[in-house]
Regions:
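Conserved ABC transporter NBD signature motif
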Residues: 11-19
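A position-specific signal in ABC ATPase nucleotide-binding domains
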Residues: 6-7, 14, 54
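Non-catalytic connector elements of ABC transporters
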Residues: 190-194, 199-308
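Helix-to-loop junction immediately C-terminal to a conserved catalytic motif
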Residues: 3
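ABC ATPase nucleotide-binding domains
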Residues: 22-182
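ABC transporter nucleotide-binding domain
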Residues: 171-201
Length: 308
């Protein structure tokens, strides 16, 4: 809809403060970068990058200047005479981006541009795109199913579920203050652990533990509340001081480890719980551990999943 390729059923699309809802695609000054590179196999890198400008009847001197400028920015200068078949996946994606950059558009729309790359290349290209957007200063709408890409690249992130907008906020706001359990579960890796807990005047009952009753949960006394605990929201404690768990595996990530443990029946959940632990801690598989939530606990309505 932003590019004008799909009809807008309601609302307005403003680009640079101008209402472009009914404008033709070529009038919107939006450049697209697709999941598939969509490069012309019979053209060189330079010809692919220049194609849109040639169609727009831009003069040759300007085309040469812009292609050279974009190629230098994307480290493609030495590859301008090659054809797509002679390029790596990362190089092809750079060419696709260069084709959009030379237009000097008002808005970039990038539709999962890194999904066809291997894991290592995705990480490096993620940084390159973020740096490129910073240097160009062009508004960029970036579509992705990868929450790591969204969190590391976005200044503001819009989370959607089945076409319905759930929350628009900064990555930090999404992580710390999700509006519902869907957003809480989508943002963060390993995923947040969710538990259905009864609430009494004494507090919130998480298995054998009694957690303090926060003000936003006071109305739930006599009912249940859904609590969410992220991996860093757990503390390892001494025997008998927390929930008894059975170590399933330890995920080693260098500077830190993630303990994945099976909960006991008192938690009424079959899913594993992920706990962030320091790199020197590595309990063996099957070894019992005791964990307790710290102050980083989120509370949700158990009926509709909205944050309390």
């Amino acid at each position: 809809m932003v590019a004008g390729l799909e009809p807008t059923t309601s609302g307005r699309i403003l680009i640079g403060g101008k209402d472009m809802t009914g404008a033709r695609p070529r009038s919107r000054d939006v450049a697209m970068v697709f999941q598939s590179y969509a490069l012309y196999p019979n053209m060189t890198v330079a010809q692919n990058m220049a194609f849109a400008l040639e169609n727009a009847k831009v003069d040759r001197a300007t085309i040469t200047e812009r292609v050279g400028w974009a190629a230098k920015m994307l480290q493609l200068t030495d590859l301008l005479e090659r054809k797509p078949a002679a390029l790596s996946g990362g190089q092809r994606q750079r060419v696709a981006m260069g084709r959009a950059i030379v237009r000097k558009p008002t808005v970039f729309c990038m539709d999962e541009p890194l999904s066809n790359l291997d894991a290592k290349l995705r990480v490096s290209m993620r940084g390159e795109i973020a740096a490129l957007q910073r240097d160009l200063g062009v508004t960029t709408v970036y579509v992705t199913h990868d929450q790591v890409e969204a969190m590391t690249m976005g200044h503001r992130v819009a989370v959607m579920k089945e076409g319905v907008l759930q929350q628009v906020a900064t990555p930090t706001e999404l992580y710390n203050h999700p509006v519902n359990t869907f957003v809480a579960g989508f943002i963060g890796s390993p995923a947040i652990s969710l538990f259905d807990c009864p609430v009494t005047e004494e507090g919130v009952h998480l298995g054998s533990l009694l957690l303090p009753l926060p003000h936003q949960v006071a109305a739930q006394v006599g009912k249940h509340v859904c609590i969410g605990v992220r991996p860093e929201g757990w503390d390892l404690v001494g025997e008998g001081e927390g929930l008894r768990m059975q170590t399933d595996l330890v995920e080693v990530l260098g500077s830190q480890n993630y303990l994945h443990a099976k909960p006991t029946s008192e938690l009424r959940t079959g899913s594993r719980v992920a706990v962030m632990i320091d790199r020197h801690t590595r309990p063996a598989s099957g070894e019992p551990v005791w964990i307790r939530p710290n102050e980083q606990v989120l509370f949700f309505d158990p009926e509709d999943g909205t944050a309390l």
